[in-house]
Swiss-Prot record:
Broad class of where this protein is predominantly found: plastid
Molecular-function GO terms, alphabetical: rRNA binding; structural constituent of ribosome
Gene name as annotated: rpl16
Stored PANTHER family: 50S/60S RIBOSOMAL PROTEIN L16, LARGE RIBOSOMAL SUBUNIT PROTEIN UL16M
Coiled-coil annotated spans: none
Protein name, per record: Large ribosomal subunit protein uL16c
Length: 134
């Protein structure tokens, strides 16, 4: 699963997901794409699950670009731990997604195949998405 090789700081604040995505909201590499319609955190496992389904469905001949990367660490405290004694340890990585962000791009396949692959990948995502073309 995806995670940064190294970061400047081990832990981050949770932050807020206000507004829409101004960066990464256009198709750059392929002809078809899956675009987010809601704000959410998408985990590295969910990104990988979507990528696998698209590659499995598109088979050879198609190319896939993953346009998001999980660069935010999410911390968790051990179960049944009392309050206090600092912030928990990093457990997994997420990508902060705002509405309009392109998640995956596809090229080298027909629109029907790309649309079907995007629909299967959309089931793996915790948000509503839409299929877009250039």
């Amino acid at each position: 699963m995806l995670s940064p090789k190294r970061t400047k700081f081990r832990k981050q604040h949770r932050g807020r997901m206000k507004g829409v995505s101004y960066r990464g909201n256009r198709i750059c590499f392929g002809r078809f794409a899956l675009q987010a319609l809601e704000p959410a955190w998408i985990t590295s496992g969910q990104i990988e699950a979507g990528r696998r389904t698209i590659t499995r469905y598109a088979r050879r001949g198609g190319k896939i670009w993953v346009r998001i990367f999980p660069d935010k660490p999410i911390t968790m405290r051990p179960a049944e731990t009392r309050m206090g004694s600092g912030k928990g340890s990093p457990e997994y990585w997420v990508s902060v997604i705002k509405p309009g962000r392109i998640l995956y791009e596809m090229g080298g396949v027909s629109e029907t195949v790309a649309r079907a692959a995007a629909r299967i990948a959309a089931y793996k995502m915790p948000i509503r998405t839409q299929f877009v073309t250039t």
